[in-house]
From Swiss-Prot:
InterPro entries: Hexose_phos_transporter, MFS_Mycoplasma, MFS_trans_sf. It comes from Mesomycoplasma hyopneumoniae (strain J / ATCC 25934 / NCTC 10110). Signal peptide: none annotated. This is Uncharacterized protein MHJ_0132. GO terms for cellular component: plasma membrane. The chain crosses the membrane at residues 19-39, 78-98, 110-130, 134-154, 165-185, 199-219, 249-269, 289-309, 321-341, 360-380, 398-418, 440-460. It is a multi-pass membrane protein. PANTHER family: CARBOXYLIC ACID TRANSPORTER PROTEIN HOMOLOG (PTHR23508:SF10). It is found in: Cell membrane.
Amino acid sequence: MKKNFILNFATKNVKEKKLSFGVGITLWALIVFAYMIFVMNWGFASAGLNGKAGISGYLGHFFPNANEAPGTVVNQAVNWGITIGRGIGSVLVGWLIVKISHKYTVILSLFFMLFGIIAPYSPTYAGFIILRTIFAIGGTMQIILIQPVVSNYLNQRQKAVISQFSPFFYPIGTIITLIPFAGIIGQEAQEAFRDNWQIVFLVIGLLTLIPLIGYIILGTKFDLYPSNIEKRNKQEKLSLATFFKQKDTWYWTILYGSWLVAVVFPFTFSKPIFHRLIGDSDGTFNDKISVFLIFFLAGMFLGPFTIGLLSKYQLQRRKYISTIITLGVFFYVLATVVFVLKVGKNYEYAKSYTDGWTWLFLFLGLFMGICLWGIQGVMLNLPHEYKGSNPYRVGFQFGLIWGLGYTAFTIATIITSLVNTPPGIDLKKLELNNVDGYALGAYILIIIFSLVSSIGLALLKEPNPEYKKLLKIRSFSEIERIKK
């Protein structure tokens, strides 16, 4: 292992300690809490704190004159650039772990997140965007940094369980960002929230100090323990180039990028597309769509205990994952049909929840969430299940899965955004006639991109081909739990 001054410092006085479950869970909790903080900070920007140029929110702050505000294409380009930056940061995680150790990579990523504290007080919009990009790179790294902890400290059964809970923190953070803008706290409270956007970002940013201080004190240098270094020296030498040459890396990119579309695009595109499909330019159903998204995200809390239970048992994974993702996308299509043909036609009930069609719409969102969020744990546990898996390999692999997955997700975002809002097209001048062709085209793309995951799964190898196929099980007694 080539050393540098940071790694030299990190390796001083390293005393090997037992890799106990309690220490592993503590480190896991600090990192997932940091990830939830990132999701909250990032989500509030698009959920409502952005406001409108010349009126309120951070857009009103930086552009008191609405005519000076950047156009739609510029805003989209900024978002694409930030997402690409997050992808690059994800790819670099594996390299950083090798160069400066896992503990110092975590601390560095949390330091990046501290830029979220000063970003709201930037004197310029450009500075605000740059500082939030640095913050976002650090935040995105958290979900990858979990994996070496899980891989080192937990046995196979514990990994299967913890993989069910790790995904909880994205929906929890996102639900928190949606609640103030879902019509629950009232219009005046919404406006107060939006007017005090700097304080909201400041408070969330300061929470980053909790995992940062916690990891400085409690973080371990498990990857630098002599026993781990000895194991790594006996293993194959890995680099980013090694994984780029492997076909499985690109199959994972297809799978993970497509799954990201399936779970993130409904949050990003549902409001503008749903409104345009019914010819509503006033956002009349904004609150109801927000509640639909909350139901969708709430599916995460049921999914791991239903859909996600497969990880605990000796059953084949690939076809099961593909079926569940397809079912989740199908529920989204059904929910859209119900909204366009029934819920969105009834303006009298736009702000109420007493009609049956509204509840069908909401519960379809819940079923969609149970499928798409519930399967994440099964999917993310796959790299741990392949023969020859080890903490060193998993760290590299997850960095690439997230980084390249984000890149694929960004490409899908650019294509969908350009179809939804083509450059040079003034949406205000379109004759809607209840169906906006651009919005419908974008929606169809979302469905197609979400289903591409099946291609990635078909190309990947089954990690345990000796496990039984779920459809061939005839009684529960045939299903065996995974042994330690």
